[in-house]
Amino acid sequence: MSKTISVEITINASLDEVWNEVSKIENHSNWMKDAEKIYFQTDKKSGVGTKIKVLTKIGPIKLNDFMTFTKWENKKAIGVDHVGLVTGVGEMQFHEISEKKTKFKWIETLNFPIYLGGPIGEYFGKPILEFIWKQNLNNLKEIFEK
């Protein structure tokens, strides 16, 4: 069993501006507060095949989240496979609403390991992760709307 989490936000910035920020993986910890540190596992820093390890902290729980980038469509979508303790897939989607407005959508389907409660952890974790990721999107929005 897995849980799908989907959050989105409209950002008052151009598609180019939003893409330029989000496509810099090393900057994700600036707005993803649960991502404490990002370590590249490949020489590549972007694009399909890039691998990262992310030290993730949610409340008292810390774990390394290993991801491989599987989709990289310029100004459209970035996709990942989670291949560590937490497995699943994720995608960030970019949609131009107008010249100075962009919709950013983040979708993740995750499977929790048994020591994090397995299906029970997924059930109770979903609203917590939704809350955190909505905050992350607000943090991203603030980068452009200060």
Listing of model-derived features with the role each one plays in the protein:
Residues 18-22, 28, 52-54, 69, ...:
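Hydrophobic pocket/interface hotspot
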